[in-house]
Design a protein with these regions (language model features):
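Phosphate/dinucleotide-binding and metal-coordinating scaffold of catalytic cores
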Residues: 1-109
Length: 109
């Protein structure tokens, strides 16, 4: 079972990020790409029909994570491993993030 998250830009579904055996995969949503005026979620992840692959969590997404005391508090309250960056992203980046991007965990049906 791969962990997945829907990535929203200003409340609009922009793409999906998932944990895969090789690391992480981010792909823009085809409807988002087809909509005129939509922006890339990051300068480091320009709009593309090809998925992005990385062995480590993309720095852009890592930048959405809390640090210091807030990180410790979130991990303690949510019972998260401080070193599970992707798990932290899925559990904490769904609201009140810096900027226009949020990540909502995609739960298995």
């Amino acid at each position: 079972m791969n962990r997945k998250g829907n990535v929203y830009y200003s409340g609009v579904l922009a793409g999906r990020i998932e944990e895969v055996p090789e690391g992480y995969r981010f792909a823009y949503d085809s409807d988002y790409l087809a909509t005129l005026g939509t922006r890339a979620i990051s300068m480091t992840l320009p709009k593309s029909t090809k998925p992005y692959m990385s062995k480590v969590l993309y720095p852009f997404f890592y930048g959405l994570l809390a640090e210091g005391v807030l990180k410790e508090t979130q991990c303690r309250k949510l019972k998260l491993d401080e070193n599970d960056h992707f798990g932290r992203l899925l559990k904490t980046a769904n609201s009140d993030t810096i900027g226009a991007v949020t990540v909502v965990e995609e739960l298995e049906a």
